[in-house]
C-alpha cells in the first residue's frame, strides 16, 4: 500500500520527501543502479564519478573488494576473484562444471547442490557473491539519495527460470534490499524508451549483454507495455565474443590452448580491449605477452558472425511466435554493451529493415527503466499517468498425464501475473491418491521437458475411475515465481507446493527446449498420438481383464472367452510397436467384441439389485 504524501497547499513535495526506491541492473559483466530525481531517471555514480560497476568480486582474508579494482586483479588472483557470477545463479554444481573451461574457480559442494567457490575467505555461493555486488550498489544509492531505500526493482534476463529468480531475490535480501519486483531486462528497456518517446506500435528489444542474449517483441499502446513474445540464448553474449578473439590470439600466436587461470584472464582482457577498440577503429594492434598482432574489424566480424547469426535466428523465432511479420516491427531498441559492436548493429538493421534506436546509453537503459518502475511501485506519482507492465512467462508450464505426456496448463508467452486451473481425474477404480508432476517446456513427452516439482494429493474418496474431479491450479506471480495447488472438488481436500528448484536450467537446456519444440513439432505430435492410443488401449485392457476375472466364467462360454482373449493378445502385441492407427483400430475391435459381455454384466447387476424387491419398493 503506497503511503499518502502530504505537502503545503500549492506546493509539491521536494525530491527528498519522496520515498526512495531504485532500479538495479544486476548484469553479468557490469551492474548499475539508477533512481528518479526531479522527474528524471538517471544512473547513480560512485565517489569517483563512475556509473558502471564491474560485476567483479575479489575476496581477501579480511575484506571484500568489488568493482574495477577487483576486475583488474582477476588475472593475478583468479581463484579468489569471481567474474560473471550471474551465469552461476540458481544452478547446481553438475551444471557449472560444464562451464569449467570458462570458469577458473575451485568449486566445492555436492553434485546436486548449490555450488560454492573456494576462496581465501572460505566457500562463497553465487548468492553471496551477488549480494556483495548489491551491497555496494545499495550503499552508493543511499549515499547519493541521502536516505534509506524503501526498496528496489531488480532486473533479470527474460529466460531466468524459477530457481534463478529466487536466487536473485535471496541475494537482494542478503544485501539488505527490499525487492519491490523482479523485472525482465527487455521490459525495463521498453519502460525507458516508452517514457521518453511515447511510442505506440510493435517494438523489438534486442538485448545483448556480457553473458546473455534476449529478444522481446512488445506492443506499446496507450501506456501499456505488453510483451507479445520472448526468446534468446543464455549462452550468448559479449563474453563469447571475447573467447572467440582469445582463440584467434592463441592460434595466431601459436600458443598452447592449455593455459593456467592467470594467463587465461590476461588473454581475455587483451581480447576484450581489442573488441572495444574496434568499435571505432578499423584495425587494432593486439598485445599479449611478447606477441603482437593486428586484428581488423573485418576479421572480427568473421569471428563473431556465427554468434550474431544465432541471435538473428532467435529474433526470427520470436517474431514468428507473435504471428506478425518482420516488416510490422516499427522500432528496434538496442540494449547491452555488446550492441556497440558495429557488426551487431548492421545485422540487426538488415534483419528488421530499419536503424535500431540507440539514443539511451545501451549500458544504462535497463537500469533507467527499472528505476522508473521502482519509483512507481514506491508510491511516487508519475507525471503523465500510470504505467502498466505485462510480462510473460518464457516457457510453458504443465503436468504429466498418463502415458508420460505433457499437458500444458499455462502456454509460453502468457502474460503474468496469471492463475490458470484445469480439471483432472483418477485413472483406476478406488484410487485415493494422485501424484502431481509439474513440468516446464514445449515438447509433448515429459522426457523432453524439465521437471520442476512433484507432490501428492492424498485422501481422495474412493470412486470408480474417472468420477473424481481434481482441480489443479497454477499461479505465477509478478516475479515469475510459480505455485501449484491440487484440490479434490467433492471432499475439499487440498495440497500445494511452491516451486523452488535447487538449481536452474543449464544454458544448453534453455536453448534446446525452444529450438527442439519447433524442430521436432511433427515428430512430437506423432509421438503424442501414439501414447494417447496406448493409454486408451491399456485402460480398456485393464477393464476387460477385470471383467473377465469377475464374471467371465459365469457370463461367457468358452468360445466367447477365446475370441476376447485373442483380441486382447493382438492389442497387447500392437502396443509394443509404433503404429498408432493400428492400435486405435484394434482398441475399437476389442471394444466391439466385448459389447455383448458388458451388456450382460449390466443386466446381471440390475437383476441382482432388484432381487427380492416388489414393484412398490422399486417405485418408492
From Swiss-Prot:
GO MF annotations for this entry? ATP binding; ATP hydrolysis activity; ATP-dependent protein folding chaperone; unfolded protein binding
Q: Which GO terms describe its biological process?
A: iron-sulfur cluster assembly
Q: Which PROSITE patterns match?
A: HSP70_1 (PS00297), HSP70_2 (PS00329), HSP70_3 (PS01036)
Q: Name one Pfam family in it.
A: HSP70
Q: Which UniProt keywords apply?
A: ATP-binding, Chaperone, Nucleotide-binding
Which CDD domains is this protein grouped with? ASKHA_NBD_HSP70_HscA
Query: What is the similarity comment for this entry?
Result: Belongs to the heat shock protein 70 family.
Q: What does this protein do?
A: Chaperone involved in the maturation of iron-sulfur cluster-containing proteins. Has a low intrinsic ATPase activity which is markedly stimulated by HscB.
| Protein's name in the database | Chaperone protein HscA homolog
Report the gene name: hscA
Amino acid at each position: 500500500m503506497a503511503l499518502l504524501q502530504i505537502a503545503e497547499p500549492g506546493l509539491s513535495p521536494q525530491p527528498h520527501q519522496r520515498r526512495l526506491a531504485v532500479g538495479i541492473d544486476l548484469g553479468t559483466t557490469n551492474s548499475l543502479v539508477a533512481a528518479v530525481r526531479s522527474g528524471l531517471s538517471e544512473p547513480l555514480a560512485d565517489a569517483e564519478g563512475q556509473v558502471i560497476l564491474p560485476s567483479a568480486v575479489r575476496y581477501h582474508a579480511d575484506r571484500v573488494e568489488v568493482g574495477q579494482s577487483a576486475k583488474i586483479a582477476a588475472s593475478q588472483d583468479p581463484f579468489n576473484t569471481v567474474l560473471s557470477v550471474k551465469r552461476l545463479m540458481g544452478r547446481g554444481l553438475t551444471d557449472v562444471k560444464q562451464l569449467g573451461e570458462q570458469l577458473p574457480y575451485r568449486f566445492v559442494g555436492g553434485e546436486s547442490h548449490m555450488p560454492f567457490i573456494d576462496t581465501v575467505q572460505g566457500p562463497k555461493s553465487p548468492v553471496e557473491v551477488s549480494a556483495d555486488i548489491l551491497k555496494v550498489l545499495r550503499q552508493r544509492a543511499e549515499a547519493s539519495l541521502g536516505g534509506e531505500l524503501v526498496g528496489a526493482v531488480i532486473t533479470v534476463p527474460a529466460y531466468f527460470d524459477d530457481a534463478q529468480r529466487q536466487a536473485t531475490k535471496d541475494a537482494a535480501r542478503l544485501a539488505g534490499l527490499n525487492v519491490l519486483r523482479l523485472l525482465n531486462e527487455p521490459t525495463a528497456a521498453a519502460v525507458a524508451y516508452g517514457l521518453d518517446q511515447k511510442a505506440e506500435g510493435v517494438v523489438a528489444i534486442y538485448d545483448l549483454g556480457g553473458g546473455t542474449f534476449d529478444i522481446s517483441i512488445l506492443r506499446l499502446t496507450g501506456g501499456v507495455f505488453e510483451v507479445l513474445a520472448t526468446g534468446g540464448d543464455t549462452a550468448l553474449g559479449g563474453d563469447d565474443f571475447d573467447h572467440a578473439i582469445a582463440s584467434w590470439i592463441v592460434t595466431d600466436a601459436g600458443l598452447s590452448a592449455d593455459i593456467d587461470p592467470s594467463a587465461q584472464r590476461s588473454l581475455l582482457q587483451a581480447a576484450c580491449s581489442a573488441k572495444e577498440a574496434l568499435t571505432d577503429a578499423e584495425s587494432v594492434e593486439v598485445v599479449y605477452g611478447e606477441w603482437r598482432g593486428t586484428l581488423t574489424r573485418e576479421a572480427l566480424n568473421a569471428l563473431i558472425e556465427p554468434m550474431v547469426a544465432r541471435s538473428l535466428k532467435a529474433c526470427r523465432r520470436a517474431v514468428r511466435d507473435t504471428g506478425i511479420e518482420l516488416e510490422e516491427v516499427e522500432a528496434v531498441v538496442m540494449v547491452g554493451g555488446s550492441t556497440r559492436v558495429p557488426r551487431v548493429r548492421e545485422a540487426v538493421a538488415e534483419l528488421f529493415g530499419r536503424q535500431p534506436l540507440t539514443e539511451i546509453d545501451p549500458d544504462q537503459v535497463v537500469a533507467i527503466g527499472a528505476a522508473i518502475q521502482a519509483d512507481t511501485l514506491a508510491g511516487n506519482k508519475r507525471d503523465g499517468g500510470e504505467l502498466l507492465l505485462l510480462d510473460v512467462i518464457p516457457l510453458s508450464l504443465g503436468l504429466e498425464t498418463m502415458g508420460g505426456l505433457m499437458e500444458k496448463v499455462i502456454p509460453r508467452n502468457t502474460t503474468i501475473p496469471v492463475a490458470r486451473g484445469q480439471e483432472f481425474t483418477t485413472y483406476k477404480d478406488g484410487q485415493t491418491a494422485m501424484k502431481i508432476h509439474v513440468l516446464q517446456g514445449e515438447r509433448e513427452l515429459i522426457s523432453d521437458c524439465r521437471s520442476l516439482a512433484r507432490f501428492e494429493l492424498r485422501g481422495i474418496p474412493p470412486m470408480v475411475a474417472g468420477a473424481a474431479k481434481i482441480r489443479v491450479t497454477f499461479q505465477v506471480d509478478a516475479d515469475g515465481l510459480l505455485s501449484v495447488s491440487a484440490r479434490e472438488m467433492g471432499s475439499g481436500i487440498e495440497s500445494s507446493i511452491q516451486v523452488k528448484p535447487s538449481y536452474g536450467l543449464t544454458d544448453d537446456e534453455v536453448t534446446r527446449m525452444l529450438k527442439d519444440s519447433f524442430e521436432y513439432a511433427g515428430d512430437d505430435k506423432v509421438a503424442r498420438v501414439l501414447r494417447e492410443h496406448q493409454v486408451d488401449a491399456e485402460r480398456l485392457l485393464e477393464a476387460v481383464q477385470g471383467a473377465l476375472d469377475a464374471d467371465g466364467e459365469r457370463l461367457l462360454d468358452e468360445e466367447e472367452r477365446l475370441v476376447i482373449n485373442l483380441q486382447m493378445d493382438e492389442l497387447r502385441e500392437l502396443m509394443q510397436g509404433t503404429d498408432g492407427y493400428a492400435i486405435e483400430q484394434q482398441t475399437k475391435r476389442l471394444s466391439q467384441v466385448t459389447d455383448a459381455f458388458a451388456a450382460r454384466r449390466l443386466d446381471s447387476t440390475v437383476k441382482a439389485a432388484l432381487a427380492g424387491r416388489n414393484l412398490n419398493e422399486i417405485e418408492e
